[in-house]
Amino acid sequence: MHLIDPPSSDVAFTPSVKAVQVRKGLRPAHRAIEERGGFATRITPDLAGFIAAQTSVFLATASRDGQPYIQHRGGPPGFLHVLDERTIAFADFAGNRQYITLGNLAENPKAYLFLIDYAHRRRIKLWGEARVVEDDAELIGRLMPADYKARPEQAILFTLAAWSANCPQHIPQRFEAADVAAALGEREARIAALEAEVARLRAGAA
């Protein structure tokens, strides 16, 4: 007997979730996603570019008993590395040393990454499993951003099961301080050039 693999969206659409979708009258729309195979399961070039541009990520884990925990990780653009179409990795910097994420992953590898780009109002959800690598100095060094002032303690490797993009609804539009400063600098330079041109024209007309 040939068994059909469940759609990848079942990572999120559990029986309980599907029951709520039925009750809300939205099950047909989500069933259509499942009939197409579910969520994407490979990192596309577009997604890889999006990941490489991020300076922030939220990593969710849970204990064996299901107690959830979410932790922020940040760094310069490129601190998140796409190793292949199923793997994302990053150097895990020393922090508050509570080690809740590491403890959770030691007993439950299920993990979730949430990426959000406020400037372009885009968010990506990624389900998978994560593992901690503490004894590979070469890997950790390769993942460490150049000239970044942080001390890496270990690496975290995330193996993708499925991912999905959300609509931009209710995402406040915010911009990186460096981008705002660059835009203001261009405006100030333009104003200075126009003021100089006005002064030149006035001097010529005098």
Regions found by a protein language model. Give the residues of each.
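Binding-site signature for planar aromatic cofactors or substrates
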Residues: M1-A206
